[in-house]
Amino acid sequence: MKRELDTADRKIVELLQEDARLPLKSIADKVSLTSPTVSARIDRLEKDGVITGYRASVNPEVFDYRIKAFINLEVEPVRKKEFYPYITDCPNVIECNCVTGDYSMLMEVVFHTTSELDQFIGQLQHFGRTKTQIVFSTSVEHRGIPLGDTRIPILEQEEEK
């Protein structure tokens, strides 16, 4: 059963999304609760599946991953049973999503070189046709999900002269 999160729970989740290493005392101060209360709330949020894990965000270039790409793959239905275990075992696949549209899968991948990427794409073509986009730059990194105001900002129109 879905449980509604109160303002304090939402603020705790928001703070942990920004910095999962934030000390309990800091969180407690920001939500005006005691550290034991915050600890109990975090435990409950984990138990209820609201918080599903904690990760370090790592700079791929430090590990010489210079190529980041998104690959669309149209998996042939008869190949899906063998595709899922294969893709799960590929460490260079950061994320793989089943999507709607012309392609059935969208993957985010990292590689050291374009030739490694090319070799991987060749392997993927065993499962179906691909379309690849290599990332030049990233304007918005992965971030936490929005918990507050989710209205899309309105662009101000320039006045016509």
Describe the function of each predicted region.
Residues 1-161:
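A compositional/biophysical signature of low hydrophobicity enriched in polar/charged and small residues
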